[in-house]
Amino acid sequence: MHAANPVNVAGLLLAAGAGRRMGRPKALVELGGVTLVERGVRLLTAGGCRPVVVVTGAAADEVGIVVRRLATRRVAGPAPAGWDAPEIGLEPTAGLIPEVRLVSAARWTEGVGASLRAGLAALVGTDTDAVVVTLVDQPSLGAAAVQRLISAAADPGSAHPAMTATYGGRPAHPVLLRRSVWPEVAALARGEAGARAWLRAHPGEVTGVPCDGTGSPADVNTPADLETPADLETPADLASGDTHTQPG
């Protein structure tokens, strides 16, 4: 049995990519007047995640400036032994968004797997029970989807160590991972697979949580994708915590 229902749920925003098809790092792209990295942080915060860890790579300094608008100090330390992760830099905030931390993934060019490993490693020494993972290039996700995953995982009848949002029955982000499976997920996270390798290898340990009507998991990969984003929450929604919900 993989255990206990989460009490403390962190958010993990993977924002390290170079965005080659976009022409610049997606984290710095603005949509609705908000950079995608800030939008992702606000999404996870509005969904109930504390802290929110942002993993950077390409244009780390520039992305860090955006996040540091909320941050006040830096704490550095080595990665936990055996996690194959770089030196971790954590930056707690004390401003608009509580508890936001920056983690630099030195091996980000290897793919999203390296970013996921670095993010999980940063949370090993915390009291976090589970983590909700999102990607910076999915700006139309709804905070209500994050809330549904956390609620489903907290259900006393829920024993599965992983949850995925589903849209029309198809699994997508956000993904919730209990602490008990982080080492297994990290071991399989290579290249562009991220958590997908573990999820596919353990279908019987994954709960699908219907999130239709909460937003869209559609990626933005090119400038053309920015012209018609699906179900985009406004900056005011993200700031206030108001989110897409399914009627009824």
What annotation goes with each model-predicted range?
Residues 2-7, 190-248:
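Conserved alpha/beta core of the MobA/IspD/sugar-nucleotide pyrophosphorylase nucleotidyltransferase superfamily
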Residues 62-63, 184, 219, 228:
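Phosphate- and divalent-cation-binding pockets in alpha/beta enzyme and binding domains
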Residues 2-171, 179, 202-213, 224:
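Nucleotide and nucleotide-moiety/phosphate-recognizing core
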Residues 170-202:
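Short, glycine-/small-residue-rich phosphate/pyrophosphate-handling segment
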Residues 143, 184, 216:
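Conserved protein kinase catalytic core
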